[in-house]
Amino acid sequence: MPDMSQLKELPFSTLQFYATAPYPCSYLPGRQARSQVAAPGHLINAGTYSQLVEQGFRRSGLFTYRPHCDNCHACVPVRVDAARFEPNRTQRRAWRSHQALRAFVAELAWSPEHYDLYTRYQQGRHPGGGMDEDSRTQYAQFLLTTRVNTRLVEFRAPQGQLAMISIIDVLDDGLSSVYTFYDPDMAGSLGTYSILWQIEQCRTLDLPWLYLGYWIADSRKMAYKANFRPLQMHVDGAWRETPP
């Protein structure tokens, strides 16, 4: 009889990949998108997922995918070289603005306080985008369902007010910034601060890369990622550093 425990360590080479049917693009209006999905999803563990991210994949809950669009290559996987990163003036200002915040690793579990912040963020920053109507179940499936090494980090003001939450995957060669949401009424570029904090965590953990997902030049929601340098892009199957 085969050792069933070996099934928990699915080699990357045995994964199967399939393309989804076309669906409306979330980032470029009027475009159709497709994704390449890694399967079987329930056997993708932390080590295998690290290899997938290195090949340009991301995850949404248990769904591990990368763009596979017809005649479009706008979505480019990007990662920051944590050791060599130097903040620009705007980023230094954001870092100073939120030094009073305290970060806590919390349980990756349902919390009414977290869901309330998520709802206010979506309604305040992305109204009409669809996610502003996410139910509790949709929220949990998106951010709380994982089979990899995931951390939920709370950022709180000195008085205890919840300002921001970052969901982060710990990989073999870095951190992957899954999603961040924050108080839309709080000034000072909290999203930028979150990325800077994650870069510092990479340095603390001696991990070389912070993976930021996909950069899309024509999407305002994604274009900001090019501001974090040195930045590498995954193009034609290889990581290449972008010009300064």
UniProtKB/Swiss-Prot annotation:
Q: Under what name is this protein listed?
A: Aspartate/glutamate leucyltransferase
Lineage, please?
A: Bacteria, Pseudomonadati, Pseudomonadota, Betaproteobacteria, Burkholderiales
According to its UniProt entry, this protein's organism is: Bordetella pertussis (strain Tohama I / ATCC BAA-589 / NCTC 13251)
Role of this protein = Functions in the N-end rule pathway of protein degradation where it conjugates Leu from its aminoacyl-tRNA to the N-termini of proteins containing an N-terminal aspartate or glutamate.
Biological process per Gene Ontology, one example term: ubiquitin-dependent protein catabolic process via the N-end rule pathway
Task: State the compartments where it is located.
Answer: Cytoplasm
Q: Which gene encodes it?
A: bpt
Enzyme Commission no: 2.3.2.29
Molecular-function GO term, any one? arginyl-tRNA--protein transferase activity
Q: Which Pfam families match?
A: ATE_C (PF04377), ATE_N (PF04376)
Going by the UniProt record, its keywords in alphabetical order are:
Acyltransferase, Cytoplasm, Transferase
Describe the reaction catalysed, as an equation: N-terminal L-glutamyl-[protein] + L-leucyl-tRNA(Leu) = N-terminal L-leucyl-L-glutamyl-[protein] + tRNA(Leu) + H(+); N-terminal L-aspartyl-[protein] + L-leucyl-tRNA(Leu) = N-terminal L-leucyl-L-aspartyl-[protein] + tRNA(Leu) + H(+)
Q: Sorted alphabetically, which HAMAP family does this protein's record hold?
A: Bpt
- Major subcellular location class: cytoplasm
The record ties this protein, via InterPro entries, to: Acyl_CoA_acyltransferase, Asp_Glu_LeuTrfase, N-end_Aminoacyl_Trfase, N-end_Aminoacyl_Trfase_C, N-end_Aminoacyl_Trfase_N
An example Gene Ontology CC term for this record: cytoplasm
Give the family per the record.
Belongs to the R-transferase family. Bpt subfamily.
Q: Which domain of life is it from?
A: Bacteria
What intrachain disulfides are recorded? Answer: none
